[in-house]
């Protein structure tokens, strides 16, 4: 395993269309699937989005659509290993928090998983992830 996809790259894959999707899938094509992983944090973010949609749903059609979105998220997360936020990541996360970085908590958790496992984060969010010392990031949508 070499690369950890941030939630933004996962979302682009879910769109299945557009220039960012085409570029990203082209960059992924030469790599074996074993090189790529998702994080439990990204799964959390996406299921939280589905939950928020369902909380706002007012019609049966919206509820059905919300659960359809949730099913799609579950299917999408079966195509690559989902890495846990384990003790090693928690230790790295605590050290990063102590540095008072101005990075959102979920992004910092993803960064901690990557640092604990020596992975490169694939993301378009260089403004946040670029602040994390020692973290390697790449944007495969450009």
Model region roles, listed by residue range:
Residues 1-2, 111, 115-142:
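Acidic, PIN/NYN-like endoribonuclease modules and their adjacent C-terminal/linker elements
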Residues 1-42, 52-71:
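Short, well-structured N-terminal submotif of metal-dependent ribonuclease cores
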Residues 5-6, 39, 103-104, 125, ...:
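Histidine- and aromatic-rich ligand-binding microenvironments
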Residues 10, 43-46, 90, 129:
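A generic structural signal for short hydrophobic patches within well-formed alpha-helices
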Residues 14-17, 50, 97, 133, ...:
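Short, flexible helix/strand-to-coil boundary loops that buttress conserved ligand/catalytic motifs
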Residues 48-54, 75-122:
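Active-site neighborhoods of divalent-metal-dependent phosphate/nucleic-acid chemistry enzymes
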